Amino acid sequence: MFLNDNFLLTTDIAQTLFHDHAKSMPIIDYHCHLDPQEIYENKHFPNLTAAWLYGDHYKWRLMRANGIPESHITGDASDYDKFLAWARTVPKAIGNPLYSWTHLELRRFFGVTELLNEESAPRIWEVVNRKLATSPFQRRNLIKNANVKVICTTDDPADTLQYHQLLREEEQAFQVLPTFRPDKALNIDASGFKDWLGRLEQVVQKPLNSYASLVSALKQRIGFFHEQGCRLSDHALDVLRYLACDEAEPEMIFAKRLAGETLSPDEVTMYRSELLTALIGFYHEKDWTMQLHIHAYRNNNTPMFRKLGPDTGYDALNDLPLTEALSQLLDRAESGQFLPKTILYSLNPKDYPALLTLMGCYQKETVGKMQLGSGWWYNDTRNGMREQLTLFADHSLLSNFVGMLTDSRSFLSYTRHEYFRRVLCGLIGEWVERGEAPDDLAMLGQMVEDIAYGNASKYFGFSSVG
């Protein structure tokens, strides 16, 4: 039966591992894109479209593939008409994880077991909207009811973190912690770089008229983020290049950019390489974990990018080389004894063996110091998860894996943790069935509990956050 108690669990051992060990473990969502202001204000969603379809480019891509007009995806159609357009799309999504996720979310959050389609949509709309108007379905209660203990948002160095501070004072059931994401500091060639620099100046209350002053300001913000509970950084390295240079070079490049001159590709790479290296040292000082998200190829549809902006469903994966540049970056940090705990993600799964074998060169003392990140974005599927888990086990110690994250903008996405846990238990159960792993429930049960929750709790050190 569809989505029965044992879906994705094809062996007895898998069923036992999930139901007795994985299912009840709390959730640490250590990388997501929820808005901390929305969490703090704790408002009701006005309807299911607002909770489900706003900002969800996963769904938008499927709707476009189904010929839905843009007016009913991101345009000015009513929320109800947008919901009906999604309901027309869902029956065609069998085999896509969104088919399972859609119905898991309806079941786990709203108790709706009916399949979503054009005929059932009006009934589901009414049932869910009535529930969304009640207290148990406010944003914070959705988080609590999903058994979430830690949420790490994604935050710019110039952000004030005011809502993190307010949540820290008021919310006892779960933590909402910032993540330091300094992409705008690194993207010196971006058109908005000088405007962003002005925002950072306002926050640090001093002029940023030199490279040295920028580095100092970022170090200051890292200290502030740490005080607010931050224990991770994150970087979008869509194209990974590395060029070392002498100490004077970044200062000259920075001055050239402020003067409005065009930078050469090599100058951009040198600046980014030096600034990222400096940041890595600061992360190490704070015992943070650094996340590197590699090989997204963004904003491919120029007309739609001009119309809708970024993060609207027009990104793909990249296939450029990465080993040499990444090795140079990691080796420079290791040689200087300031390589922090690191999680490496690639949007292109062909990169997994390269990342895994490279990270094995830098394991040291800390258990699982270097990690291959959970299947990211387009790899957040049953097959993608199994590939990531299998290759992790092939090249490292899967028992030390820090597990799943949502990487989501949706308050209803926590069922992805259940989906991941079922895939994990199913895979281990297959290993036992084939004689590749012992039928030792105590050992395997502990492994599953660790990957679901325990490893992340220890690795990131959230318990030290007051």
Where are these regions (language model features)?
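Short, basic/hydrophobic alpha-helical segments
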Residues: L329-S335
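Hard-cation-handling environments
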Residues: A296, N301
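Metal/cofactor-centered catalytic core regions of large enzymes
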Residues: E267, G313-A316
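C-terminal amphipathic alpha-helical interaction region
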Residues: M290-L292
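Short glycine/proline- and charge-enriched loop/turn segments
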Residues: F305-G313
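Metal-cofactor-binding active-site regions of metalloenzymes
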Residues: M1-K286, F338-P340, L344-K350, L356, ...
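Divalent-cation-assisted or electrostatically stabilized phosphate/pyrophosphate-binding catalytic cores
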Residues: D319-L326
